[in-house]
Swiss-Prot record:
Name of one Pfam family that matches: Glyco_transf_22
Glycosylated residue positions: 188, 321, 361, 508, 526, 550
Pathway: Glycolipid biosynthesis; glycosylphosphatidylinositol-anchor biosynthesis
Residues that span the membrane, as ranges: 92-112, 145-165, 192-212, 254-274, 288-308, 339-359, 371-391, 398-418, 429-449
Membrane-protein topology: Multi-pass membrane protein
Residue stretches in coiled coil: none
Protein name (record): GPI mannosyltransferase 3
Gene Ontology terms for molecular function: alpha-1,2-mannosyltransferase activity
Length: 612
């Protein structure tokens, strides 16, 4: 096929217009998300830490804890490896700062002793100067461990939103009527898209958190922008090659992402078939094969680095989450969960705009292709929602990779609606109220709601001379070494919740799964019985050392720790009475949440202390 020169020129005009209108947006996005990330100091779900920061910390610093997924090779290491790199850079910075300060402080101490050789004060000052490098280096390393991943995620988040806005511009320019005055409306839709993405409640709450779903959304937004929306004209371009790479990389990390690209690939193939361009179809699938091979090899190398063997976590992920019933171990939601809960929460105040954009007639399609960009996007969204609704285990974040397309239809809906609403200038004076309220709510939740489980790990890091710490609460209720960052604690443990992996492949797995209980289940089914069975009994004559270290006593799964950390719900229900005369005292109480969907996590965090 000979590419139409007019079509090619139009594509170049589209790219030029997009560059012009987005040149100043990226710094705004970065600045906004940096503030967003630094304000985020609350807990949402365990995967934010245990599937990204914890394996990275384990690899970079040589200590920590890995969940069962990493022990059986269910997860790809590609996303955590980014944070390992960040951690290693932090280590280098800490070492460099220590060396630089050591030289400076040594010179200062030497001069002090040289000038005042008989002074006790000078000797003490010189001694104190020599301790500064170690203390400063440890401080630099700890703050780097906490905040460097946040800043990195802010940069990634801004990148994802930047390409989302460019995608919206690109699709808009490819679908508007040729008779429209494009540039004024392009400016308007750019402003609308920027407003929608920055003030979206779920974006502010979620996008800078270290979830694989955030990374998946960012990869998806880059791939969608570089996708061939022209019906085949751009297949031979570098841009389309980039799209394939980022799309396939996203699919390897999260196989469910493939639904997006199967639909788009189907429409691209159909458009080429309708034009009878069989040569280009051959080139398309040849390029797909080559890019897939390269992408898979890159990921295999990354996973080999972590697992020390050639492994394909993507297949184990599919087996556990899609072809077995074990994913239901983590909860089952009704079929309408995403329709009635995920979409309203993810879209927020832009939900009416999205619905309007979804059901609006498609604009005139350029390049005379049968299935235009908007029609394809609507199919992608509908089929993905159907697919995710079919899965029994559902979470809001599973559909987060669709956020660029949600934003696209919302922005187009807002642009169309703005032209039809009367007294628009009057409404314009008040339209900022709803986005502002959305941001206020998100700031409150990211700053306060469930902040205690993060703060307690920071407090433990700063505590001196810790012998042992135990968390008696639902499993993975806190981060681990990614916030504690200490390798000098003799015993550090928490209640576990291992899934029944022995049921994989069993015919009666669905029946046995219903009766399976993990350690957390046993704890809350019978708190008194669990404590008495798994911990040594207190007696008035015993101190902590006798209870935990007497070899003649029967051994228990858990020992009573120096620091015992529980939720207020457990304290009120059992622990406050049981620990009377045990030697434990309430050491601290940290605010965690005003209310919680999980009653086991209600209230503040209670820290008990007993000196060994």
């Amino acid at each position: 096929m000979v590419t139409n020169k007019k079509d090619t020129d139009e594509n170049r005009d589209v790219q030029g217009s997009i560059v012009t209108k987005t040149s100043a947006i990226f710094p705004v996005l970065v600045g906004f998300r940096v503030i967003n990330s630094l304000l985020t100091r609350t807990y949402f779900q365990a995967d934010e830490f245990w599937q990204s920061l914890e394996p990275a910390h384990y690899k970079a610093f040589g200590y920590g804890e890995l969940t069962w997924e990493w022990k059986v090779g269910l997860r790809s290491y590609a996303f955590p490896m980014l944070f390992e790199i960040i951690y290693r850079l932090v280590k280098l910075l800490a070492i460099a700062s220590k060396e630089a300060l050591s030289i400076i402080c040594s010179i200062g101490a030497g001069l002090m002793l040289l000038c005042f050789p008989q002074s006790k004060l000078a000797t003490e000052v010189a001694r104190d100067l020599l301790t500064i490098p170690n203390e400063y280096s440890e401080t630099v390393e700890y703050y780097g461990v906490i905040y460097a991943p946040k800043l990195f995620m802010a940069l990634l988040a801004a990148t994802g939103e930047y390409f989302t806005i460019k995608l919206i511009q690109k699709v808009y320019l490819k679908t508007v009527s040729k008779n429209d005055d494009q540039l004024p409306k392009l400016s308007n839709i750019t402003k609308i898209a920027l407003l929608l993405t920055l003030t979206n409640f779920f974006n502010c709450f979620f996008i800078t958190r270290t979830f694989i779903n955030s990374f998946e959304m960012i990869l998806t937004s880059i791939a969608l922008y570089n996708w061939d929306w022209s019906g085949g004209i751009e297949i031979n371009t570098r841009s389309f090659t980039k799209s394939l790479f980022f799309a396939m990389f996203a699919c390897i990390q999260r196989p469910s992402n493939a639904i997006i690209w199967i639909v788009l690939g189907f429409f691209l193939t159909i458009n080429l078939l309708l034009r009878r361009d069989y040569t280009l179809i051959g080139r398309l699938y040849a390029k797909i094969l080559v890019v897939f091979t390269i992408t898979m090899l890159v990921n295999v190398v990354i996973d080999f680095y972590f697992y020390n063997q050639i492994i394909f976590p993507v297949f184990k992920f599919i087996n556990f989450n899609f072809t077995s019933i074990l994913s239901e171990f983590y909860g089952v939601a009704p079929w309408h969960f995403h329709l009635l809960q995920s979409l309203p929460i993810m879209l927020g105040y832009s939900l009416p705009l999205f619905i309007y954009g979804l059901f609006s007639n498609d604009s005139t399609t350029k390049n005379n292709i049968r299935f235009g960009a908007l029609r394809q996007i609507k199919f992608v969204l509908i089929l993905n929602i159907i697919f995710y609704s079919y899965l029994k285990h559902k979470e809001f974040r599973f559909i987060y990779p669709l956020q660029p397309l949600f934003c696209l239809l919302s922005a187009l809906g807002a642009l169309k609606l703005a032209g039809k609403v009367q007294n628009y200038r009057y409404l314009k004076e008040y339209v900022w109220i709803i986005p502002l309220m959305s941001m206020i709510v998100s700031i409150f939740i990211t700053t306060f709601q469930e902040s205690g489980v993060i703060q307690v790990m920071k407090d433990l890091h700063n505590e001196k001379d810790i012998d042992s710490v135990g968390f008696v609460m639902p499993c993975h209720s806190t981060p681990w070494q990614s916030y504690l960052h200490r390798n000098d604690i003799r015993q550090l443990w928490a209640i576990s919740c291992e899934p029944p992996l022995h049921l994989l492949g069993k015919n009666n797995a669905s029946i046995e799964l219903q009766t399976y209980m993990d350690e957390s289940d046993y704890l809350y089914e019978n708190i008194s019985g669990f404590i008495k069975k798994n911990f040594p009994k207190f007696t008035n004559s015993m101190d902590m050392e006798n209870v935990n270290n007497n070899a003649s006593m029967p051994q228990f799964p858990h020992e009573w720790p120096q620091f015992l950390i529980i939720f207020e719900q457990l304290d009120n229900e059992f622990m406050s009475r049981y620990l009377l005369d045990s030697g434990y005292v309430k050491y601290n109480k940290i605010f965690n949440s005003y209310s919680h969907w999980d009653s086991r996590r209600n209230g503040d965090l209670i820290i008990y202390y007993k000196n060994n």
